[in-house]
């Protein structure tokens, strides 16, 4: 899929005595200007008497953090009142639960229904920057946990300080793409740009030891295609 100008794949699976079909092909959906991308695909034909030998093999190198993730239990914690959270994790440690990677879920960034991504300022109701710095130091330095924040660059709320309609992906009929509730889907290129821009600011302020990136691997590439004809890679699932 990453060597294709197509918008999405399609499948037709069929099995009968004289015929078997699996998968299908690709679709080239018109962009916002009504044009389609030039056809570009790469095909591999493999023959083998063993089924597993014809399956795609993608590079999957060992994570440099395997020594941490492989020896710890991960907990995505629904951050609430910080004093209550401190007491909770202090009690967990007293019971011997020490090898834990803990990440705040999106409620670390928000108090109510406001934006929870594309942010460098934590929820005011949880103490803002000072509250987050204090909590990060307590979780890591006092309790010894691996601890960090939530993030994603797939859900973008109109109340966010960086909001602009040109940040959002477009559907083929030039409408803003929807994402999680109260959010729109950022252009894929903006995810790369804003992660590089905001993550260093967050880390400089709070000195985390881990982070949780949500959603990106849960949404198929062809479900977040940007059809905005003005941008490079428009209409392609590879972009």
Q: Where are the regions that the model predicts?
A:
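Aromatic- and carboxylate-enriched substrate-binding clefts and catalytic-loop regions
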Residues: 1, 99-239
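Carbohydrate-recognition beta-sandwich/jelly-roll modules
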Residues: 1-114, 120-126, 138, 142-147, ...
């Amino acid at each position: 899929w990453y060597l294709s100008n197509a918008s999405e794949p399609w499948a037709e699976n069929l099995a009968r005595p004289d015929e078997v079909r699996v998968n299908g092909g690709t679709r080239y959906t018109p962009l916002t200007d009504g044009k389609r991308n030039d056809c570009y695909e790469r095909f591999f034909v493999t023959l083998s008497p063993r089924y597993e030998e014809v399956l795609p093999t993608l590079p999957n190198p060992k994570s440099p953090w395997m020594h941490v993730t492989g020896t710890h239990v991960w907990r995505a914690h629904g951050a609430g009142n910080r004093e209550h959270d401190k007491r909770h994790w202090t009690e967990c440690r007293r019971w011997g639960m020490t090898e834990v990677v803990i990440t705040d879920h999106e409620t670390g960034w928000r108090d109510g229904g406001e934006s929870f991504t594309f942010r460098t300022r934590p929820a005011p109701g949880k103490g803002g920057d000072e509250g987050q710095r204090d909590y990060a130091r307590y979780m890591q330095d006092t309790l010894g946990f691996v601890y960090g924040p939530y993030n994603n660059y797939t859900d973008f709320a109109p109340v966010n300080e960086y909001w602009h309609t040109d940040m959002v992906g477009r559907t083929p009929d030039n409408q803003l793409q929807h994402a999680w509730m109260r959010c729109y889907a950022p252009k894929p290129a903006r995810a790369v740009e804003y992660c590089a821009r905001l993550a260093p600011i967050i880390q400089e302020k709070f000195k985390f030891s881990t982070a949780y990136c949500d959603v990106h691997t849960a949404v198929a590439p062809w479900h977040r295609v940007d059809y905005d004809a003005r941008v490079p890679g428009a209409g392609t699932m590879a972009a």
